[in-house]
C-alpha cells in the first residue's frame, strides 16, 4: 500500500487493537512498515522512582499497560497483515534504559522493567515470526533523547534532538 493511513484507537484495549487490524483486513491491505510510538514515562501524579521504596503499584501497572502490553497485542493482530512477498518491518520505540546489561544508574524501576519486558517481547516475537514470515523484521528502536513531554523533566544539559531529527535517523535504519 503506497499511502500512509492512520486509524484512531484506544491503545490500551485488545478490543480496539483488534478493531484497527480489522480495518486493514477489510481493505485487504498488506503493511510494509508499522511503527509503534506508544510510550509512557510519567504523569502528573508520578515521576520515575529514584529508589525501591518509591515503587507504586498503580504507576508500575500503568507503565506495563502502556509500554508493554499493547505492543504484544499489536504484534498478535498486525503481524499476519505484514507483507510476505517483500521485506516488511514492525518497529516499536523502546528505550536504552530497558537494557538490563546497560543499567549503571539504577532507579526508574517501572519504566525500566516495562521497557525490558517490551524488548523481550520484541526479541521473542522476532524469533517466532521468522518461522512464519521470513521477510518480516520485528525490531525495537531507541530513538535517543528527544525533546518531548515525556523527556522534558529529565533533559537537563543533555544533547537533545527534535522529534523530526529522531524520526529521520530511525527511518535510515
Where are these regions (language model features)?
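A glycine-rich helix->loop->beta "capping" turn
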Residues: 23-38
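Catalytic loop of short-chain dehydrogenase/reductase
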Residues: 40-44, 48-64, 86-132
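Conserved active-site helix of classical SDR/Rossmann-fold NAD(P)-dependent CH-OH oxidoreductases
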Residues: 72, 116-127, 164-172
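C-terminal helical subdomain
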Residues: 140, 148, 153-173
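Hydrophobic structural elements of the Rossmann-like NAD(P)H-binding subdomain
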Residues: 35, 91, 138-141, 151
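Conserved Rossmann-fold SDR core element
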Residues: 129-146
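Rossmann-fold cofactor-recognition segment
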Residues: 2-19
Amino acid at each position: 500500500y503506497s499511502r500512509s493511513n492512520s486509524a484512531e484507537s484506544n491503545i490500551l484495549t485488545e478490543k480496539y487493537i483488534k478493531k484497527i487490524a480489522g480495518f486493514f483486513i477489510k481493505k485487504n491491505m498488506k503493511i510494509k512498515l508499522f511503527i509503534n510510538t506508544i510510550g509512557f514515562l510519567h504523569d502528573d501524579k508520578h515521576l520515575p522512582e529514584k529508589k525501591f521504596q518509591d515503587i507504586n503499584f498503580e504507576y508500575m501497572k500503568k507503565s506495563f499497560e502502556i509500554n508493554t502490553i499493547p505492543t504484544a497485542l499489536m504484534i498478535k493482530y498486525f503481524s499476519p497483515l505484514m507483507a510476505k512477498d517483500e521485506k516488511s518491518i514492525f518497529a516499536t520505540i523502546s528505550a536504552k534504559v530497558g537494557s538490563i546489561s546497560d543499567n549503571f544508574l539504577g532507579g526508574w524501576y517501572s519504566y525500566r522493567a516495562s521497557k525490558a519486558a517490551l524488548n523481550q517481547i520484541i526479541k521473542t516475537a522476532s524469533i517466532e515470526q521468522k518461522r512464519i514470515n521470513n521477510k518480516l523484521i520485528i525490531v525495537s528502536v531507541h530513538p535517543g533523547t528527544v525533546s518531548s513531554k515525556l523527556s522534558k523533566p529529565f533533559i537537563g544539559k543533555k544533547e537533545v534532538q527534535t522529534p523530526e531529527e529522531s524520526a529521520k535517523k530511525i527511518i535510515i535504519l
